[in-house]
Amino acid sequence: MLKRYMLLAVATVFFAFQVLTSTATAAELDDATRTVALNEGSTVTLSTQQAKEGQRLFNFACANCHIGGDTKTNPSINLSSASLAGANPRRDNVEGLVDYMNNPTTYDGFDTISEVHPSTQSTDVFPLMRNLSDEDLFDIAGHILIQPSVIGDQWGGGKANR
């Protein structure tokens, strides 16, 4: 009987600890972490609500292929800061990423790929993009740009950095 009570006490402490602790949330991100490039000359500080919503929308519409910032269909191109900066046009800012989500192009920028990459142009093929507004795309872009500051090289770093 005493053994049963001890197990119950240990289980209660364990579950109480789980309830009282949580992973990092958008509310815990400071202003410096939530500040990202708006375009090539300006920055913007996302609100905690925008950061939270960006994470939710990314998980809803993008994480199937871009889990952890990697790209399942093309592992050589990921969502790391270096990859986004190397794209033409640059995609390492909010406006560049929103433009890409509206009009996706190849890494060199020469060819459109809206038929094979989810975008607001191809909602018939990729229905998850159907109801995303420009504000939603802004929040998703903010989430993508925040991640290198939150999880470092693990974001877009592939299996080697996990």
Curated annotation (Swiss-Prot):
Q: Which Pfam families match?
A: Cytochrom_C550
Q: Its Gene Ontology molecular function terms?
A: electron transfer activity; heme binding; iron ion binding
**What membrane topology does the UniProt entry give?**
Peripheral membrane protein
The record's cofactor note says: Binds 1 heme c group covalently per subunit.
A GO term (biological process) for this protein? respiratory electron transport chain
Going by the entry's taxonomy, the superkingdom of the source organism is recorded as Bacteria
The cellular location(s) given in this protein's UniProt record come to: Cellular thylakoid membrane
Q: Where does heme c bind?
A: C62, C65, H66, H117
- So which residues are the signal peptide here? 1-26
GO cellular component labels: photosystem II; plasma membrane-derived thylakoid membrane
Give the protein's cofactors. Answer: heme c
Q: Which UniProt keywords apply?
A: Electron transport, Heme, Iron, Membrane, Metal-binding, Photosynthesis, Photosystem II, Signal, Thylakoid, Transport
Record's function text: One of the extrinsic, lumenal subunits of photosystem II (PSII). PSII is a light-driven water plastoquinone oxidoreductase, using light energy to abstract electrons from H(2)O, generating a proton gradient subsequently used for ATP formation. The extrinsic proteins stabilize the structure of photosystem II oxygen-evolving complex (OEC), the ion environment of oxygen evolution and protect the OEC against heat-induced inactivation. Low-potential cytochrome c that plays a role in the OEC of PSII.
The family this protein is said to belong to: Belongs to the cytochrome c family. PsbV subfamily.
Which HAMAP family does its entry note?
PSII_Cyt550
The subunit structure is:
PSII is composed of 1 copy each of membrane proteins PsbA, PsbB, PsbC, PsbD, PsbE, PsbF, PsbH, PsbI, PsbJ, PsbK, PsbL, PsbM, PsbT, PsbX, PsbY, PsbZ, Psb30/Ycf12, peripheral proteins PsbO, CyanoQ (PsbQ), PsbU, PsbV and a large number of cofactors. It forms dimeric complexes.
The protein, known as: Photosystem II extrinsic protein V
